[in-house]
């Protein structure tokens, strides 16, 4: 049996050091039919009589995304299937919720849905042509952004978990959340705004996904030419500054010994955070390997359960 922490976020599904975009669409991958190569982070998945591409298509970011449609379940089972070479997989999993939904009835509803999966026979899913039989034997829901539960630091600490769809801001004291909120500010929206700005200023057309891949760059390639986009750094600075204002509204910042920042956009925005909080502010930490922080926390949570 395997134990697996899965961070099924608005942007990416992360697990065991692997990831794919939290997107799905009905279709087939040409690479599996011998037409070119299969993209590493896209997977052809057959489930419940339909064939999907997981890792491409449309994101599912609505507040009820855990309960409507097949998308959440599809990404969850795909992550489990990819995590093991075995055909028949028994597993225990830990998944996350943003801090505000976690503190609400959403947690109980998600736990109920996941526990319903544990009562079913093994789910059959075919990933990139390989059949998998998956039985979820236990499912735990944990809070996103709870890095202190990994380090077990008892100091007064603020954690800022930067997601593609939301930002979790939590102040901890003695491992207890004393102030928290889920801020509806989206890196996905920022990527779209930067792409639109480049288009509207006559420099060419790029996708938000391309901006994400080159986030923070001062030059990017458009139509075979290097194009200066250094002015977009001001957009990033304003975004970070606005989030810092949210942090001050939510938390007692002067009391915090550390401010720990992680998530998909953390490393690329490290300097912006230090500038926004002020160069004199000590204790600001941008965590390495930030995109996988939550999945690593969930992994430790499920491994500790007896």
Label every PLM stretch briefly.
Residues 163-168:
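Ser/Thr-glycine-rich phosphate-binding loops at phosphate-binding pockets of nucleotides
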Residues 1-159, 176-189, 209-306:
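Nucleotide/phosphate-binding catalytic cleft detector across ATP-hydrolyzing
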Residues 171:
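A translation/RNA-centric and nucleic-acid-associated enzymatic feature enriched
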Residues 202-206, 210:
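Short, basic interhelical loop/turn and adjoining N-cap
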């Amino acid at each position: 049996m395997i134990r697996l922490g899965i961070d099924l976020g608005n942007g990416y599904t992360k697990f065991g050091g692997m990831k794919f975009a939290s997107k799905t669409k009905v279709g087939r991958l040409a690479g599996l039919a011998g037409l070119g190569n299969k993209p590493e982070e896209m997977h052809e998945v057959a489930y419940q009589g339909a064939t999907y591409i997981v890792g491409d298509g449309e994101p599912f970011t609505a507040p009820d995304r855990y309960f409507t449609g097949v998308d959440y379940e599809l990404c969850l089972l795909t992550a489990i299937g990819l995590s093991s070479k075995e055909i028949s997989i028994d597993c225990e999993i830990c998944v996350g919720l943003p801090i505000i939904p976690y503190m609400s009835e959403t947690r109980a509803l998600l736990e109920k849905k996941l526990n319903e999966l544990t009562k079913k026979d093994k789910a059959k899913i075919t990933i990139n042509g390989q059949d998998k039989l998956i039985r979820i034997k236990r499912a735990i829901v944990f809070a996103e952004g709870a890095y202190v539960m990994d380090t077990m630091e008892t100091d007064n600490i603020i954690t800022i978990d930067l997601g593609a769809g939301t930002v979790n801001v939590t102040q901890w004291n003695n491992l207890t959340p004393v102030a928290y909120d889920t801020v509806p500010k989206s890196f996905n929206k920022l990527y779209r705004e930067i792409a639109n700005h480049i288009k509207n200023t006559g420099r060419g057309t790029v996708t938000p996904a391309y901006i994400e891949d080159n986030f923070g760059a001062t030059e990017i390639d458009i139509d075979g030419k290097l194009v200066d986009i250094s002015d977009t750094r001001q957009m990033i600075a304003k975004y970070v500054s606005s989030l810092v204002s949210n942090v001050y509204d939510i938390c007692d910042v002067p009391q915090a010994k550390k401010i720990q920042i992680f998530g998909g956009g953390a490393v690329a925005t490290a300097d912006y955070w230090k500038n926004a909080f002020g160069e004199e502010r000590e204790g600001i930490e941008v965590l390495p390997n930030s995109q996988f922080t939550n999945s690593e926390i969930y992994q430790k949570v499920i491994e500790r359960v007896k």
